Amino acid sequence: MIVRSTIVRGAMRFSGVHFLDFQRLGLRIALLAAIALATAPLNLAAAQTQAPALWTVPEVGALPNDAFGSQIRRGRDLVTATYALIGPEVPDQTKRFAGNNLACSNCHLQAGTKKFGLPIFGLFELFPQYSARRGAEITIVDRVNSCMVRSMNGRELPNDSPEMQAIVAYIRFLSSGVAQGQIVPGLGAGAMPELKRAADPVRGRAVYVKSCLACHNTDGSGIRRSLPTTDLGYMMPPLWGPDSFNDGAGMARLITAANFVHFNMPHGADYLNPQLTVEQAWDVAAYLISQPRPKKAGLEKDFPDLLQKPVDTPYGPYADGFSEQQHKYGPFAPIRAAIARAKKKQ
């Protein structure tokens, strides 16, 4: 009753109408409509992403201190402190698998458990799956190693290595209770409306200076945990430069980067409370991907079926006749239309 009376008073304030009788069905419907309008999201992008169902993420801290629990905790540590365990500066040179001092959790936020923060929660049961980039079916091990050579700019972990086994165990643990093939709402980076124009790195620089520079530095180099070395990783990760992800990483693609930024940045933002507008997110992501970063060899071999190549892949070859510039910054609707026409001719 308290909630109802509070809502009614709020609705009366918004509508400016004095209701004398709430028992009649017609007025009840009108009241509910007024409440819905008054509390509707004001941000278009937030409205575009459906609120996912409640997640029940298993608690790593509740695991027993046995071999099973230790392996999963080790996997979580490899996700959150990658640089300290398999980074390029660890004392044991045989363990230097990552080529930069990032952590997996710089992209897979909150140790892979944040909705629309590129979570790894619920992913295990989606594998094996077909990979357009490989042109073949891949396992969860293949997917982890794809991140190792692209986002971590390093080399593959051996399939039977303790590190790979621990990471896979952690991903499996996070998927506890998720059915095989179930796609959990909240995966990925979200989906906001696309621009009808190309995303603009020049406009994006202004957004970066205002909203990103304080954490990620003027030159995108981030904030290190220790000076002058990077052996303890970063408080705030580098967004470009030699210690960042390479140009074959998913975050080097505009659609992924823009949605990730919109639903997660600046710090404190989420899919319910984005802090940047849709245009700001697209433009600042364009600025980010326009900056120099490590080059991955062999990118021309990605996506053997070029008609399955994502429209925002920033490197050729292409099968649609559009330039690398448009693939990198958009607009993407004309590219999608051309690909659809080409597929119909197959």
Residues covered by each model-derived region:
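Extracytoplasmic electron-transfer domains, predominantly the class I c-type cytochrome c fold
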Residues: G69-R73, L78-I86, N106-L157, I167, ...
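Post-cleavage N-terminal segment of exported redox proteins
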Residues: I2-V3, F19-L20, I29-I86, Q129-P201, ...
